């Protein structure tokens, strides 16, 4: 959520931001609500001043044994008016906050202006595409041929956009989770947490999924419970409504969770394979940091996510998301896109973002500098480290051999009993 004072003083700037983000949202209702709000506050202040002054007059009249009944009756009417205005103000402030929650974050000045993913510039690349002397297959064909992925039975159990992992498929998924967590905790210094996989609406509001993206979520019927769309939600909200000490920052957390998404609006996209599922596993990285270090921490976060792909020997590129493609809560985002030879394309495998104080303001996460009483909002960051299913996809497609087997990256073999290939 943006700061109210900033919104009030920068209407033109925010209008431009909304256009750059390709968002059809007028600030006129917010400006009108703010006008009403300030009018009521002024009137309440004047009435209270009048009431306080009248109280002194009433005291003087009583002391002088003069009639004060008319003034007392007038003040009763003033009190009734103040009560009515307070009720109006409560309603207006609720509408005001609801509208503020619909305004996305301001992009950082370094974010390129663009319409969609076609305008995302490539920031860097690592490695090279594998040289295959045969026609590469997509991962769903590889997995089904090896008997490690079963989409037909998954559809029988749950429906479309689910997968059943068999044998080495299940073992490979589990190995990747352990591998990622080990690197992030032992090499990168993150603290591992295992959060609830169900969250309430307050947590989703804090990280920005609600109210705008309600249709993307799975809600439990008749309960204020939602399945987590990403570990970002429960992990960021660990410190909701808390004030941390400066010495406690930065906070670095990593967590594995399954993620659940309705994929509303994705009809017809990626209907085969593991790329777009209702349920998938992900290892998440979350940071709570001081404002002045957040962009340095974003670059470190990106490197931490890249490290996983480098250890696995998978070719990838990093793109900077333009204004028209970036997420609602983000001030700046890098996407890591891994090369998939079976589909002859790059696909997102991690998204690393700095939200500045946007989420912290919504979730009320603050910190206090040493020797000061005043508190400030922390800056929050997160990134996938990585999406586990898509990493498995990349291993199958990049490691496929002409005989139909799949070579396991050496770094992952200790997690699989030193097996070198799946056949």
UniProtKB/Swiss-Prot annotation:
This is Serine--tRNA ligase. Catalyzes the attachment of serine to tRNA(Ser). Is also able to aminoacylate tRNA(Sec) with serine, to form the misacylated tRNA L-seryl-tRNA(Sec), which will be further converted into selenocysteinyl-tRNA(Sec). Its EC number is 6.1.1.11. The keyword Metal-binding does not apply. NCBIfam families: serS. ATP binds at residues 261-263, 348-351. Coiled coil: none annotated. Consists of two distinct domains, a catalytic core and a N-terminal extension that is involved in tRNA binding. The keyword Electron transport does not apply. GO terms for molecular function: ATP binding; serine-tRNA ligase activity. One of its GO terms (cellular component) is cytoplasm. Gene3D superfamilies: Bira Bifunctional Protein, Domain 2, Serine-tRNA synthetase, tRNA binding domain. Pathway: Aminoacyl-tRNA biosynthesis; selenocysteinyl-tRNA(Sec) biosynthesis; L-seryl-tRNA(Sec) from L-serine and tRNA(Sec): step 1/1. Keywords: Aminoacyl-tRNA synthetase, ATP-binding, Cytoplasm, Ligase, Nucleotide-binding, Protein biosynthesis. It comes from Syntrophobacter fumaroxidans (strain DSM 10017 / MPOB). Belongs to the class-II aminoacyl-tRNA synthetase family. Type-1 seryl-tRNA synthetase subfamily.
